[in-house]
Amino acid sequence: YLVDFEEPDVFRYRIAGTEISETFGHGNLKGKTLSDILSPSGRDFVTNRWLPVIREGAIVCMKGQVYNSMNRYAFGERQLLPLADEPDGPITGLLGVTVSKWVERLGPVERRNSDMVMFPAAKVP
């Protein structure tokens, strides 16, 4: 998925794969913000996890529970990379890749946030 950033803290999908769109009950996420597809608490949670990409130029790697819905959840890995319109310009969005496997819920399951590691993209050789 490719997501544009708008100040102060809005993430808007430019493009997303079919599986991600269907996860959120939409045929197409183009132009949708996190507020359009998530509850207010879900939007705040994702925004806080994505903001280091924009504010710090961080590459973010996550592993564990990467999606959570009413009747199933997904475990896997996710990487978020900062994007800029110009080589030394401000970060204007992110590129995300998620690989996961869905598991059906058999009963109440406590949400466990995925583990997250960040490092500066500028440090990558």
Pin down the residues of each PLM region.
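Sensory/regulatory domains in signal-transduction proteins
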Residues: Y1-M116
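Signal-transducing coiled-coil/dimerization helices and immediately adjacent hinge/linker segments
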Residues: M116-P125
